């Protein structure tokens, strides 16, 4: 490589960019194009410019490291190798130096270490982040098409998800909060797996009640948790630990656990102190409708008895319904609804007894947090993929940022290990600015004085010193 070729590449890229913008402008005037086509052309051009700049910068950094006296004391040059890397701007290819340590004999590419590029990385972290972010909301196939200009496979998306692993937003706790009442809501989804069986990812979320924001009611300080395959007691121990870590438990007077009455949800009553069960009104209404589908006149009677907290009258109305049913299948359906309501009576009557009860929105949340991505369409998940995606869904809902997560099970021990001194950085920047300005001064188009688009760009580069 020629000495200080970096400035030549950057300047040539600027010239090429200007010429191609002028060409696009000519196509716009001569052939016509709409705004979408114009944006696409410009994006393609800026991506190309960006790729060229990145390649030039990496190779210049490699040259600076190679000339560094500290490097010469510790590392021996072995050879130069090319590397191809997929980025959000598309594929880049650069040449970098391979070294052997004088101290322990290990081999590495110091410029890759400085930029935290792994030895076997083929895809840059920014692309992986986009792949996973997109996959949280849509299919692997769509995600792969949106992340970067290059074609990536669905397997590449899954690999990125596997690399990030099971993520969770860890809230910074400066001081435990004081609340009088705490609410826990829980539900599960039913997801078909590739092997033909079903899995039931479970959603639990903790909040401090409802508050109005922008004209609508939202849950206050809500925190979501996802579980796939865990035992009920392990779920509730985890929830109990969250409460202990975030709240002053001695200040809590009541905790409500709301849901559809499934045994795994009621298991929480054993593990969460001061807790009471609240039945989700959605499921209560579902069973009332189910029981009265053939005899709707009984619907009002059942609701009146429920709202008055009269358990005996509820039994009596159901007995009348069973007696009135003509088919055995209808009788069984009514008996099932009766059993469900009576088994969850404590969670029903609490609405009349406790003014702090606010109901349950778990059905809507399970649809929004899980079903929209996991079960609404027959996707055929693997158990591993389902668990990772369930965790990612709640990570996103909790405001998590994938850029703040440590990726990969094995951290590159050399990543970021080679750093230039402040003096080296200052000298490199000064040299590039000086050399670039000299080269700009020598360009014919500037000396002629004719005002052209290229002239304007180069003049701006020269006097604004943006390079």
From Swiss-Prot:
Pfam families: UPF0236 (PF06782)
The organism's place on the tree of life at top rank: Bacteria
InterPro entries given in the database record: UPF0236 (IPR009620)
Membership in a protein family: Belongs to the UPF0236 family.
Protein name listed in UniProt: UPF0236 protein TTE0610/TTE0881/TTE1053/TTE2432
Organism the protein comes from: Caldanaerobacter subterraneus subsp. tengcongensis (strain DSM 15242 / JCM 11007 / NBRC 100824 / MB4) (Thermoanaerobacter tengcongensis)
């Amino acid at each position: 490589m020629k000495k200080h070729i970096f400035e030549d590449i950057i300047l040539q890229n600027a010239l090429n960019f200007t010429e191609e913008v002028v060409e696009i402008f000519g196509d716009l005037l001569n052939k016509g194009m709409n705004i979408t086509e114009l944006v696409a052309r410009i994006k393609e051009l800026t991506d190309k410019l960006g790729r060229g700049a990145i390649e030039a910068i990496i190779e210049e950094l490699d040259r600076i490291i190679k000339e560094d006296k500290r490097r010469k004391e510790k590392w021996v040059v072995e050879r130069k190798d090319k590397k191809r890397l997929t980025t959000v701007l598309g594929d880049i290819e650069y040449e970098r130096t391979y070294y052997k340590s004088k101290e322990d004999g290990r081999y590495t590419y110091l410029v890759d270490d400085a930029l935290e590029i792994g030895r076997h990385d083929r895809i840059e972290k920014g692309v992986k982040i986009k792949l996973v972010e997109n996959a949280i909301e849509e299919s692997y196939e769509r995600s792969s098409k949106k992340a970067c200009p290059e074609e990536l496979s669905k397997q590449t998306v899954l690999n990125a998800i596997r690399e990030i692993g099971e993520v969770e937003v860890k809230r910074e706790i400066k001081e435990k909060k004081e609340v009088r009442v705490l609410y826990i809501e829980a539900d599960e989804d039913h997801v078909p797996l590739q092997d033909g069986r079903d899995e039931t990812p479970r959603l639990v979320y903790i909040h401090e009640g409802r508050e109005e924001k922008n004209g609508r009611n939202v849950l206050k300080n809500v925190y979501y948790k996802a579980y796939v395959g865990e035992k009920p007691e392990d779920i509730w121990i985890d929830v109990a630990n969250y409460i202990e870590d975030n709240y002053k438990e001695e200040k809590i007077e009541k905790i409500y656990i709301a849901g559809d009455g499934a045994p795994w949800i009621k298991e929480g009553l054993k593990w969460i102190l001061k807790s009471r069960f609240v039945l989700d009104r959605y499921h209560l209404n579902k069973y009332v409708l189910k029981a009265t589908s053939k005899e709707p006149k009984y619907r009002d009677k059942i609701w009146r008895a429920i709202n008055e907290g009269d358990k005996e009258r509820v039994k009596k109305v159901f007995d009348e319904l069973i007696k009135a049913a003509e088919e055995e299948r209808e009788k069984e359906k009514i008996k099932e609804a009766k059993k469900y309501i009576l088994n969850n009576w404590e969670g029903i009557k609490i609405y009349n007894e406790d003014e702090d009860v606010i109901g349950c929105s778990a059905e809507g949340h399970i649809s929004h947090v899980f079903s929209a991505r996991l079960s609404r369409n027959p996707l055929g998940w693997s158990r591993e993929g389902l668990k990772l995606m369930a965790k990612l869904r709640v990570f996103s809902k909790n405001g998590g940022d994938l850029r703040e997560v440590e990726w990969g099970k094995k951290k590159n021990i050399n990543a970021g290990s080679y750093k230039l001194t402040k003096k080296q950085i200052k000298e490199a920047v000064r040299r590039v600015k000086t050399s670039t300005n000299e080269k700009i001064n020598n360009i014919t188009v500037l000396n002629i004085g004719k005002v052209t688009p290229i002239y304007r760009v180069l003049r701006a580069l020269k006097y604004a010193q943006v390079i």
